[in-house]
């Protein structure tokens, strides 16, 4: 085969954060230490105490 160098581990950027609930890497909300993707946040926001103002 040949030499194979594994990809470097990511330390910064969008590929680092994971959703705690589903493991998705896209559109993760980090504010307040949530680390939830926006889809999961919409499902659990009300029980967590977030309210819609409008």
UniProtKB/Swiss-Prot annotation:
The keyword Ribosomal protein applies. The keyword RNA-binding applies. Its cofactor is Zn(2+). Keywords: Metal-binding, Ribonucleoprotein, Ribosomal protein, RNA-binding, rRNA-binding, Zinc. InterPro entries: Ribosomal_uS14 (IPR001209), Ribosomal_uS14_arc (IPR023676), Ribosomal_uS14_CS (IPR018271), RIbosomal_uS14_euk_arc (IPR039744), Ribosomal_uS14_sf (IPR043140). One of its GO terms (molecular function) is structural constituent of ribosome. Binds 1 zinc ion per subunit. Pfam families: Ribosomal_S14. Zn(2+) binds at residues 19, 22, 37, 40. GO terms for cellular component: cytosolic small ribosomal subunit. PANTHER family: 40S RIBOSOMAL PROTEIN S29. Part of the 30S ribosomal subunit. Belongs to the universal ribosomal protein uS14 family. Zinc-binding uS14 subfamily. Binds 16S rRNA, required for the assembly of 30S particles. This is Small ribosomal subunit protein uS14.
């Amino acid at each position: 085969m040949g030499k194979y160098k594994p990809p470097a581990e990511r330390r910064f950027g969008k590929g680092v954060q994971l959703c705690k609930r589903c493991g998705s890497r896209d559109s993760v909300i980090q504010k307040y230490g949530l680390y939830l993707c926006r889809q999961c946040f919409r499902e659990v926001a009300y029980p967590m105490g977030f309210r819609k103002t409008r």
